[in-house]
């Protein structure tokens, strides 16, 4: 009887260990990846006509985890290619919002929604994947606001 109990205890311990190894970890859910380069779809209103792209950094060692962190930028199409660096965006599911640092008293704010977050895997280049409201601010006051669609543009 003692031998049966020892064998049973060993089998139980082995089974518990194999379940612990095989079970997926639920303590670290995968982070949402909304990184990419996005350009305004169609002809934008005059106040936003000089925006070349919006770049959103990834949650990796080259983006949010870099030192210092890279969250992205709003880049103008002027000769200097002025970048308005993003503060850390807020991402909740498919929703994103961000603000930029001011350059010469001008800054931008955005609130929008991704149609899906697998646009890179599905190679959805030049397709609308993000819609939202972009605001241009001067000295902290809104000077222009528009509902815009953005295409995914691989490689910027």
Label the model's feature ranges.
Residues 1-9:
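Bacterial N-terminal signal peptides that target proteins for export
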Residues 8-18:
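Bacterial N-terminal signal peptides
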Residues 20-22:
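Signal peptide processing junction and immediate N-terminal pro/mature segment
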Residues 24-156:
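Central antiparallel beta-sheet cores of small beta-barrel/beta-sandwich binding domains
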